[in-house]
Amino acid sequence: MSGACSLSLLSDRVYNKNKMTEKKVKHVGLLHRISSCFTKSSFASCSCDERGQAIDEGAGQILAALEEAGKEGYIVGGCVRDLAMGKVPHDWDITTSARPEEMLSIAALRGWKAIDGGGRRFGTVIIVLGGENYEVTTFRSERYGSDAHRPSEVSFAKTLKEDLMRRDFTVNAMAMDRSGRLYDEFGGLSDIERKRLRTVGDAGERFSEDALRLFRACRFAAQLDFMADSSLVEGMESAFPRVSGLSLERVRQEMDRLLVSKHAARGMDLLVRSGLARCSCRIKEKGAYMEVPILPELSHLVGLPQQKEFHKYDAWYHTLAVLEAVSPEPLLRWAALLHDVAKGMPGIRAIRKGRLTDYGHDKKGAEMARDILTRYRRSPAFTEEVVWLVENHMRFHFFANSPEADAEKWVRQLARDHVFASSEAMAESFLHLKDLCKADIIGCGRPLSATEGHEAFGNYMAELSRRMPVTSKELHYPKDVPAILAPHVAEGMNNLLFRVQNGDLDNAEEALHEAALRFKKRHGM
């Protein structure tokens, strides 16, 4: 029952106190309690008292109240997993033998705010303590039917073991009582030690019950940096037909969480190599369901060779390396994932003078990125920003490596074409493009020092952008210029803007004032 296995916590698993600056002050004490246990020994070999001291104050109060009422209560799932990995949990979930109505009565006696979170159907009551929400759920078992994600029947269970049996992965199927006694029925601690992701029971059954668990497996691999157990991978395919019943909204949510994870490459590799990326989910629009492919466009990159002179890895490993080299922002992670998506495509892949080439993959990739993000129902602004990064990453490399080229013309053209809403937006996009292209270099197997030129060039382009007006509102004209241009203010302003963007006129008060007077004279005003 209790975890008897030894858990070796690596130094990079111990929570860094310097990262606590944005945490609420009340978590600092909890951090010290967790750290004091981990500095002595592993979570598994800590005494019950030491483990019990790591429980959040609010969760501890709820467990104590349940105990006083003669009910069983345990913290469960992700919070126990996080404690075992030396992390401060984000959420504290509690499972109990108490029925929802009993939990509501316990809360009322103590003056706690309690919210019925679907108690009758799912057995959940939300307790609010100190501004934090704690989900308290009655032991339950589930039966699944035709729905790809939701159980068709939820019934209350009698024991903790029954409740733990319904959970997805062993690392999420551990519980701990207020005294610190650990309940690890399925070897979750052992899997944490081995950095292994494994299902509770038969993988095929777990995934077929709830097809969203397929995506959760990929996401947990990315978040925890765990290797998927062979039994898990083998069990995935049997549940693929169930993916068609999942909503795009839920799949997109899991994908976004995966992509911003520290080890996103591990999760994406599982998604693609398992074949899950070739499945489709669905969205309901205008009363009818539409099929939405996950990411089949990525599959052809696996094993796709690249010119050894420039690339250390094949196209897929290169993509994964770039993915992890950029900062974990959705915009940059999507751009990294799709920046080379068109490599190897018909009409793109060729052999020229004995070399593998993919000329035009940036333009074609931008088209594919737009299609992908549009079907994912991402906002137009987000989509176009990713598309711009994919389309221009090779152009950035060219200018960064060609000091003699006139990069300022690029900025002027972007301003004239109104690609961006403001000069600051253009500058931000160049900084994003710089980060993507630096990651692209690192993803070729080159050292960070090889990106110094790109760093300098990207900063230069951002500064040029900030000085380049995109709209007439960004012209530095004196207050009397609109009056001078009247009644042709709009035409006159556009003329001044165009001349500044072309480099024929300085964006300065005196120059713009003189230009306005000349415009007025030419138009006989």
Question: Where do the PLM segments sit?
Answer:
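Catalytic cores of the polymerase beta-like nucleotidyltransferase superfamily
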Residues: 5, 9-525
